Amino acid sequence: MAQHYKTIGLIGKPNHDGASATIQTLHKYLLANEYKVIVEVSVAQSLDIKKMKTGTLTDIGEQADLAIVIGGDGYMLGAARVLACFDIGVIGVNRGNLGFLTDLSPSEIIKPLEQILSGKSRSEQRFIIEAEVYRHGKLKSSNSAVNEAVLHAGKVASMIEFEVYIDGTFMFSQRSDGLIISTPTGSTAYSMSAGGPILTPNLNALSLVPMFPHTLTSRPIVVDGNSEIKLILANDNHENLQVSCDGHVILTVMPGDEVIIKKSECSIRLIHPLDHEYFNVLRNKLSWGNKLY
């Protein structure tokens, strides 16, 4: 088999029996076919493999040509945020629920993987976003998000008040439970559950989706993906405010703070099987109707 990739990184959810079994299968297969393999260190501890090379996500990003992530979309998001700034392809094996980002089935993995490893695959760039919190003009914290950045109160069902600016132009002020700023990748996640639009992955766009706004006229809006979105928190908000990045990373926000959300310079290079079709994924995952005839 011709080798399109030379070094493969294996990443999986630690202490997950299904993920561990898949990683052990892949590790054995890849070594037998003379690939170099790096196993992410946190999952390596739960594997029954005597000799293996291990490394952090950063090590895999720096040394590998392809990363195979075994888990659900949530674990894929965590790995992708780190790997986005490296020149590495990423493909997922679904060990979760819906699996919008994880193409391969663990029960039928070797045949499609052979095709991918020989270069018979599709490559797709997905942009990510950066969220930055400023206090009195100084950067206090920042992080990236593959799916969405969400401004919200720290406690459930608590309204907050803020202003929204697009490229420095005032758009609106709002009292609501928060605001979701979603990428096209995230448009089938939290944003969709909140009534936001589905954006096809090739769009250079961001959607702003209000969370339970205290008005009947507030609706989601789609803006250019190169826009800089600025949220200014009202001074009379309660102190317990947050920005969540993909639901994993929490940035603390105080009344009067400014939150800047914009496209990152990094992007994810997703690798898909040749027969991958985005609308087919939507149809299967969301139980849409098939062709009539």
Curated annotation (Swiss-Prot):
GO cellular component, one term: cytoplasm
InterPro entries: ATP-NAD_kinase_N, ATP-NAD_kinase_PpnK-typ_C, NAD/diacylglycerol_kinase_sf, NADK
Class in the EC hierarchy, top level: transferase
Keywords, alphabetical: ATP-binding, Cytoplasm, Kinase, NAD, NADP, Nucleotide-binding, Transferase
MF terms in GO: ATP binding; metal ion binding; NAD binding; NAD+ kinase activity
Reactions it catalyzes: NAD(+) + ATP = ADP + NADP(+) + H(+)
Binding-site positions, NAD(+): D73, G74, N147, E148, R175, D177, T188, A189, Y190, S191, M192, S193
E.C. designation(s): 2.7.1.23
One example of a Gene Ontology biological process annotation: NADP biosynthetic process
Cofactor(s) named in the record: a divalent metal cation
Subcellular location, record wording: Cytoplasm
Residue numbers annotated as active site: D73 (proton acceptor)
Major subcellular site: cytoplasm
Pfam families (alphabetical): NAD_kinase, NAD_kinase_C
Role, per record: Involved in the regulation of the intracellular balance of NAD and NADP, and is a key enzyme in the biosynthesis of NADP. Catalyzes specifically the phosphorylation on 2'-hydroxyl of the adenosine moiety of NAD to yield NADP.
Family of the protein in this entry: Belongs to the NAD kinase family.
This protein's name: NAD kinase
Organism of derivation: Colwellia psychrerythraea (strain 34H / ATCC BAA-681)
